[in-house]
Design a protein with these regions (language model features):
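Conserved N-terminal segment of class I S-adenosyl-L-methionine
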Residues: 1-107, 112, 128-132, 161-166, ...
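A short beta-strand submotif of the Rossmann-like class I SAM-dependent methyltransferase core
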Residues: 115-118
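Helix-to-beta-strand junctions that scaffold the AdoMet/dcAdoMet cofactor pocket
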Residues: 122-123, 138-139
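Conserved helix-to-beta-strand junction in the class I
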Residues: 133-137
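Conserved beta-strand signature within the Rossmann-like core of class I S-adenosyl-L-methionine
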Residues: 139-147
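Acceptor-substrate binding/catalytic loop of class I
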Residues: 152-170
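Short, P/G- and charge-enriched loop/turn segments at secondary-structure junctions
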Residues: 203-211
Length: 224
């Protein structure tokens, strides 16, 4: 159990780094973790792969909230700082330093693939290869999230540069069901209207979930 004194569980160094500090590789109130959790099975078995795992938010939440019956959590990442962070807190059973789009797994060997806020950091060509690789290795479910709007690179943060944008049609043509989150508008730290936009983001989510063409982010789910 996480400690609860002196400010609650956010005093725990892992939780503080994942949720509180504005460091890439963690999360923010605008990220789709509740929706990822909704589509993640309650009981997990076999290999669970988190592509571009960052600081391990997906792996951390899976360990907290799911029954792992012989499941093996595997993270793929290329950033050494993130890799060391995940190893320090034992978030994954195995973490592999592996650039995308190629995946180091056998055909139909992975039960669940998470690819959250990753594909937009690849070129269009690389992203299509990644989708082919996911089809090759996954035998269970794949969950992909990506912005439904192109974001400019934040100053001083070239690693987070967006190189492509993906549409509802791109995913549906490959057999994914697509849902929406938020409202299609730019959301950037430092925007003087950010709080208003955040409120609109939450307010419109029940609508954009059903009509993803107006959403700020897409969540694509495919069962194999």
């Amino acid at each position: 159990m996480l400690p609860t004194k002196k400010g609650g569980c956010f005093e725990h160094p892992l939780v503080k780094n994942l949720f509180v500090e504005k460091i890439p590789g963690g999360t923010s109130p605008l990220f789709p973790q509740p929706f990822i959790a909704y589509f993640t099975p309650i009981i997990l078995k076999g290999d669970i792969v988190d592509l571009g795992c960052g600081k391990g938010i997906n792996g951390f939440l899976i360990r907290l909230s799911r029954y792992l019956q012989g499941a093996k959590l595997i993270g793929l990442e290329i950033n050494n700082d993130y890799i060391n962070f995940c190893k320090k807190f034992n978030i994954y059973d195995q973490i592999i330093k592996q650039p995308l789009p190629k995946l180091p797994f056998k055909d139909k060997s992975v039960n669940l693939i998470l690819c959250t806020e990753v594909i937009e950091h690849l070129t269009r060509k690389e992203g299509l290869i990644l989708l082919d690789e996911i089809d090759r290795v996954c035998k269970g479910r794949t969950i992909i999230t990506t912005p439904n709007i192109f974001f400019e690179t934040m100053p001083g943060d070239p690693e987070d540069k967006h190189l492509s944008i993906w549409s509802i049609k791109d995913f549906k043509s490959r057999g994914y069901k697509v849902y929406g989150i938020g409202l299609k508008m730019p959301l950037l730290w430092g925007d003087k209207f950010l709080k208003i936009k955040q409120a609109l983001y939450y307010f419109f989510t029940p609508i954009s979930y059903i009509f993803p063409f107006i959403s700020g982010s897409l969540i694509a789910v495919k069962d194999f």
